[in-house]
Amino acid sequence: MATFKDACYHYKRINKLNNTVLKLGVNDTWRPSPPTKYKGWCLDCCQHTDLTYCRGCTMYHVCQWCSQYGRCFLDNEPHLLRMRTFKNEVTKDELKNLIDMYDTLFPMNQKIVCRFISNTRQHKCRNECMTQWYNHLLMPITLQSLAIELDGDIYYVFGYYDNMNSINQTPFSFTNLVDIYDKLLLDNVNFVRMSFLPASLQQEYALRYFSKSRFISEQRKCVNDSHFSINVLENLHNPNFKIQITRNCSEMSFDWNEACKLVKNAGAYFDILKTSHIEFYSVSTRCRIFTQCKLKIASKLIIPNYITSNHKTLATEVHNCEWCSVNNSYTVWNDFRIKKIYDKVFNFLRAFSKFNINIGHCSSQEKMYEYVEDVLNVCNDERWKTSIIEIFNCLEPVELDDVKYVLFNHEINWDVINVLVHSIGKVPQILTLENVITIIQSIIYEWFDIRYMRNTPMVTFTIDKLRRLHTGLKTVEDDSGISDVE
């Protein structure tokens, strides 16, 4: 059983404030939610289990029980998850406020301990002080957190997470902030709490405390497309698709890291809860993570033989050719932008390849084919440039004054001509490596200009950012007809 979950279940009975703050979906009646196979820690109840996606950020960080309350660590309502979430630079004073919140919600004194022991011993089989009956008393106060970086902002979700060595398929990584506070001060807090426990439970408490307060922080993970809801990924290839999210909001005016101080004044806390409401947002999928996902899928479907072919049709419109036909049944081709990029890139590659080396037709087997698979994946700058350089070198360029050139005198379509004029100012007869890189970048940037894209989608924005963008009508970017260049 998850220690944090058990502590919330038992401690919520001691007063009105706790009954409100410590209310977890996992301790209430279960409501069905989409089952998944993602393993990790639920940020709401801290148990390690199968996770489902959050309705506030579409990432997998909530269990199927807690999902009924729709809480997200990015909310603006002072529920327990939000009050345990800190952002960016965390100071010693802010950590002291967090410890005070824990001490307020999970007090440990002689009266509380006797009360819990008395309630437990009403059952004949529970006369001994066994850990399974007193799990809620064995939750130490630690500065253990799950951290995530979203577009330059680092969020720390504090809690008590059991079984730290279990499978973690989420973008969150364990981080220990005890050094920012003070190990000895934290030790003293826990030794005082431990002194109220029966001797048979003190050893277990101490073991749990030291294992969760002395661990080495993990390396921070990179967020990728697999960390977001499969429902979002399945609809990425629809340019008009918008992600629907809900956020729990309130009129909370505190600085981000000071939300935990609200429990010190129960009256003020309940006044803020009276302003609680849900806000709905429809946001664009436009970001580097999802763009790279689409370009990677398209890269796997590349048919390099088109470069050596003599087809008059565009690369994605070749049919009944054993070597050049593209499988159009994949949903990635539903995005007309991907098709336009693919057609232009391969029309250009064919034009400057066929004039420089003696190549035949569709069935030709050329060395450059092995480098073509990364030609669309511009998000991975190192691999992409390596791919272009290798293709360029396969064309046996002529070197003059330490600059390599290839000839460019082959038929191209009007769309590519427009790109050439826009990117290098003319339709050239010779090309350098820099010209080739600039031209292919221009083709891709016309629709997906990753230079100006945020890394993660807008679903990871705080409510303040979402409100500002919503006011400026920028949460929804209509991708159906206007390119980045336009």
UniProtKB/Swiss-Prot annotation:
Ranges where the record places region Important for cytoskeleton localization: 82-176
Biological processes per GO annotation: symbiont-mediated suppression of host cytoplasmic pattern recognition receptor signaling pathway via inhibition of IRF3 activity; symbiont-mediated suppression of host cytoplasmic pattern recognition receptor signaling pathway via inhibition of IRF7 activity; symbiont-mediated suppression of host NF-kappaB cascade
Stored InterPro entries: Rotavirus_NSP1 (IPR002148)
Chain segments carrying region Interaction with host IRF3: 317-486
Annotated spans, RNA-binding: 1-81
Keywords noted in UniProt: Host cytoplasm, Host cytoskeleton, Host-virus interaction, Inhibition of host innate immune response by virus, Inhibition of host IRF3 by virus, Inhibition of host IRF7 by virus, Inhibition of host NF-kappa-B by virus, Inhibition of host RLR pathway by virus, Interferon antiviral system evasion, Metal-binding, Phosphoprotein, RNA-binding, Viral immunoevasion
A cellular-component GO term for this protein: host cell cytoplasm
Motif IKBKB-like degron (ILD) motif positions after renumbering to this chain: 479-483
GO molecular function, a single term: RNA binding
Sequence motif: pLxIS motif, positions: 480-483
Post-translational modification: The C-terminal region is phosphorylated by host CKII/CSNK2A1. Phosphorylation of the DSGXS motif is essential for host NF-kappa-B inhibition.
Chain residue ranges for the region called Zinc-binding domain: 42-79
A Pfam family reported for this protein in Swiss-Prot or TrEMBL: Rota_NS53
UniProt-annotated location(s): Host cytoplasm, Host cytoskeleton
Record family assignment: Belongs to the rotavirus NSP1 family.
Entry's free-text remark on domains: The integrity of the zinc-binding domain in NSP1 is important for degradation of host IRF3. The pLxIS motif targets host IRF3 for degradation; however phosphorylation of NSP1 pLxIS motif is not required for its activity.
Record's function text: Plays a role in the inhibition of host innate immunity by inducing the degradation of key host factors required to activate interferon production such as IRF3, IRF5 or IRF7. Associates with components of cullin RING ligases (CRLs) including CUL1 or CUL3, which are essential multisubunit ubiquitination complexes, to modulate their activities. Recognizes the host NF-kappa-B regulator BTRC through the presence of a DSGXS motif in the C-terminal substrate recognition domain.
Subunit structure of this chain's protein: Interacts (via C-terminus) with host IRF3; this interaction leads to IRF3 degradation. Interacts with host IRF7; this interaction leads to IRF7 degradation. Interacts with host CUL1 and CUL3. Interacts with host BTRC.
Protein's name in the database: Non-structural protein 1
Organism expressing this protein natively: Rotavirus A (strain RVA/Human/Japan/KU/1995/G1P1A[8]) (RV-A)
